[in-house]
Amino acid sequence: NKAEKNIDIYLSDKQKDTIKAINDNNVTIITGGPGTGKTTVIKTIIDIYNQKKYKTVLCAPTGRAAKRMTETTGEEASTLHRLLEIRKINDDYLKKQDNEYEGMPIDADLIIVDELSMVDIFLMRYLLKCIYPGTKLVLVGDSDQLSSVGPGNVLKDLILSGEITTVHLDKIFRQAAKSKIILNAHRVNSGMKFLSKEEDTEETKEDFFFIKESSQEAMLNQVISLCT
C-alpha cells in the first residue's frame, strides 16, 4: 500500500501476488503480453527496495530496451553487455570468451532483467556467473515474442522447466486497452482476427492500420515505401 501511494498507482490482485512472489523467492519470472502491467510491477518493487535502502540493478539485452527501461521506471538501466563488461565481435569470439569468462560479482540486492526473450544462452550464462549468493533475480519478458537471435530460447525454456516461480500477467489495463496495437497483438496471439475499422470506439487510439495489397510484389514495395 505504501509503495502504491509513493508512485501513485493501483495494483491488481495478480500484481500484488507478483510482488509477494519476488519477496518470497530468489528467482522469479514475470511474463505477459503488452499492456498487462509488467512495468508497473517493476516500478513498485524498485520503490519497495529503495525504501529499504537496498541496491537495485536494472538491465536489458539491447541499448534500446535499456533506454526504454530507464524512461518507464525513472531509474538508470544498462545493457547486459555493459553491466557484465563483455563484448561480442562474432560468434567464434563469443564462444572463446565464454570459456574464459569468469565475471565480477554484481553488487546488488536485486537484479531485474527486462526483455529476457532477447537473451541467448551465452549472455544468460555470463549473468548467472556474476550473481552473489542471496541476490534476488527478477526475469521479465513476453514468452510469446520471438526468441533471441543467438542460440537458445532462454525465457520459454525456463518457464517450461517448472523449476522457477513464474507469474503470468494476462489482464490488459485500461490505458493499454485503448491501443489497437496492443489489442490486436493479444487477439492474434489468441488466434483471433484483427479489430476492424468498424469496431473502433471513441476511446480507441488510431495507432494500428491494415493495408491490403494484391500481390507479394506490391506488398514488398509498400513495406519499402513505408520504411524509406
What annotation goes with each model-predicted range?
Residues 1-20, 90:
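Pre-P-loop entry segment of helicase/translocase ATPase cores
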Residues 14, 23-30:
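Pre-Walker A (Motif I) flank of P-loop NTPase domains
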Residues 18-21, 144-228:
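Conserved helicase motor core of P-loop NTPases
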Residues 22, 33, 61:
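P-loop (Walker A) phosphate-binding loop of NTP-binding proteins
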Residues 28-31, 57, 138:
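Short hydrophobic/aromatic beta-strand immediately N-terminal to the Walker A/P-loop
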Residues 38:
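Conserved lysine of the Walker
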Residues 41, 45:
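Hydrophobic positions on the alpha1 helix immediately C-terminal to the Walker A/P-loop
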Residues 55-60, 64-130, 171-172, 181-182, ...:
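Conserved P-loop NTPase motor core of helicases/translocases
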